């Protein structure tokens, strides 16, 4: 058995080996639509390779993060220090979920990665398209993205001229941003309008159960638009499955999207001197524009 397979098995089954990596769901608690769309993923070689680089940080990094945290958001501080790298999906997992292993047919396909961070996940998507556009609120992260060749603009406004000039997009990804957006409902509407109506796919990752706040400098504020997630909140003690069902039923379908695939993956963050990595549970939705709903709305 390959080493990475042995390591993945240890991480999945032995809590003492590190934070548990959970890819499973209780299908009896899911809505029927989620149950039929569920794609079982697992810890693959690329995921294990990322975990292998998570050796914890130094005291100097920890001290630097603490000092910068007095003046900057956590995202900005991580960008300045070049630490806190995230991992959501491997390239093979993205290809499986999107059912795409080659660039968009005919060439010219385009990707919009909203809140792209340092571009680690963008890299998994970029091979599927010819044109990559990214947005980020953090200036240090924008610098990282542009250095990697991912055309980036510092904005939270999807009506930004640069973003709008490149639509429609064949793929739009919104990975762990919805719960940090000030106006998540408006954002979903704008994404639907920018997505190619026939071939476009919307890749959404959300930590569940749901907990929303907006980073403004060193403050964490409540969003001005609240999603109808009562019963699916972290504060409610909701399960992952119940929260996912509520998000689909109360938010995504009313926003004009149709579900294609659903999965669960660990949302990994490179750690610090306390532990090598941290993990949350991400719900992954692959969606497309619901043409019938759009016609009724118009």
Positions of PLM-derived features:
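Conserved beta-strand signature within the Rossmann-like core of class I S-adenosyl-L-methionine
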Residues: 199-208
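A short His-aromatic
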Residues: 176-180
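A conserved beta-strand element that flanks and buttresses the S-adenosyl-L-methionine
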Residues: 173
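Class I SAM-dependent methyltransferase SAM/SAH-binding core
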Residues: 118-160
């Amino acid at each position: 058995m390959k080493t990475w397979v042995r390591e993945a098995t240890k991480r999945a089954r032995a809590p003492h080996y590190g934070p548990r990596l959970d890819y499973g769901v209780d299908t009896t608690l899911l809505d029927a639509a989620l149950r039929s769309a569920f794609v079982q993923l697992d810890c693959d070689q690329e995921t294990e390779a990322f975990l292998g680089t998570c050796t914890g940080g130094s005291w100097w990094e920890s001290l630097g993060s603490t000092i910068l945290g007095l003046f900057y958001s956590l995202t900005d501080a991580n960008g300045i220090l070049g630490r806190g790298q995230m991992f959501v999906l491997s390239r093979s997992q993205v290809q499986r979920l999107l059912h795409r292993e080659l660039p968009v047919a005919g060439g010219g396909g385009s990707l919009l990665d909203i809140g792209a961070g340092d571009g680690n996940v963008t890299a998994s998507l970029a091979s599927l398209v010819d044109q990559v556009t990214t947005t980020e609120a953090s200036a240090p992260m924008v610098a990282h993205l542009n250095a990697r060749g991912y055309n980036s603009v510092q904005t939270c406004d999807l009506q930004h001229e640069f973003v709008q000039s490149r639509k429609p997009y064949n793929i739009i990804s919104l990975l762990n941003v919805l719960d940090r957006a000030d106006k998540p409902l408006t954002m979903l509407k704008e994404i639907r309008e920018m997505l190619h109506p026939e071939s476009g796919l919307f890749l959404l990752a959300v930590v569940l159960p749901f907990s929303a706040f907006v980073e403004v400098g060193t403050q964490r504020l409540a969003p001005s638009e609240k999603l109808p997630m009562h019963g699916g909140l972290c504060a409610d003690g909701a399960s992952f499955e119940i929260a996912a069902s509520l998000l689909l039923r109360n938010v995504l379908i009313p926003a004009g999207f149709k579900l294609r695939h659903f999965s669960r993956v660990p949302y990994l963050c490179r750690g610090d001197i306390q532990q090598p990595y941290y993990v949350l549970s991400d719900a992954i939705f692959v969606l497309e524009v619901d043409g019938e709903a759009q016609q009724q709305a118009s």
